[in-house]
Amino acid sequence: MQIVNFYNLPTKNLSVIAIKAWVVKLASHYEVQIDNLTVNFIDKKQMLEMNQKYLNHDTHTDILTFDYGNHQVINAELFVSEYMCVLNSKENDQTLENEVLRLISHGILHTLGFSDKTQD
């Protein structure tokens, strides 16, 4: 089974079909399967509250990953900060679409066991 859902995409220019294709391609590259992946785009306030509640960080972040899988099967919820997504895209001179793909990829890599501190 392969379920990929998106909620509150930050722009209508984003193609859900294209993002799903990117996610499937990334999973295939790492030779893992997708069981269920939910990507939620949330506002600045919601992200700060979640970061405080779940990580005890009193700062903003661009993505939180809740992994329920086993590094071979992706079963996760990603929470992407719409605010940070827009900010990052401007600061890095990228389109919003590219930044969305980067952040989703970042979250998926967390489900595969990569951490922000990994040298790879």
What residue spans do the PLM features occupy?
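An acidic/histidine-cluster motif and surrounding catalytic segment
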Residues: 1-101, 109-120
